[in-house]
Amino acid sequence: MKKMTELGYLCMSFTEGPKTMLAEISPCHVCLNCGLEEYGQRTIGYTTSVLNHMLMGLKLGLMRGHLTKEQYDNYQWDVAKVPDSHRAITEQAYTWFEARKRQLMRSRCIVFTGAGSLYGVSLEAAVKFWEMPQVISIGYELEEGMHGPNYGYDYNHCVIVLNDGGKESEKAKSLARFMKEVNHNGLM
């Protein structure tokens, strides 16, 4: 941070609290108030960091004229709904998992794959799935998941294809169908 600031770069930090070393030397600091991250590999502030980056992007979009005030306000309204919707999403995820628990837990590896913005979702899903039920998992971009690893997929691999109905929807459906029909271990 010191070197970047000395070189004339505009710098900003996001930390769990105001008393961290980075917060104290940062010319612009955002306090996430997520609590102490006792272990470096635990990222309790990840979701808060993502949300803050999104909010900054919205504000910059408004300031630079890429968003109208009405669009900006609508996005802010959506953001305000997140805490309340979290409980419902958690319950839906639990119900989804319970209905598929046997299939998932008998698999030696869970593979998440998705196109476009769902690639990031597949990576995060793989991390969370390894953390929570503690089953080895990996995330691929849809194209990667179709052309390389699919020759190695077998009934031990549960491939979860994320599909938002976008331009890669047919490819996503094709991979899911292949895993369901040939290897009997795919979900969409």
Where are the predicted features?
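Anionic-ligand anchoring segments at beta-strand to alpha-helix junctions in alpha/beta enzyme folds, i.e.
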Residues: 12, 105-154, 186
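A short, structure-level motif marking secondary-structure boundaries and short turns
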Residues: 85, 109-112, 160-161
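A short, well-structured juxtamembrane/interface segment
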Residues: 89-106
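Ligand-binding beta-strand-loop-alpha-helix segment within the catalytic cores
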Residues: 77, 81-94
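Well-ordered alpha-helical segments embedded in enzymatic catalytic cores
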Residues: 52, 95-99, 145
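Glycine-rich phosphate-binding loops that contact phosphosugars or nucleotide phosphates
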Residues: 1-81, 115, 150-188
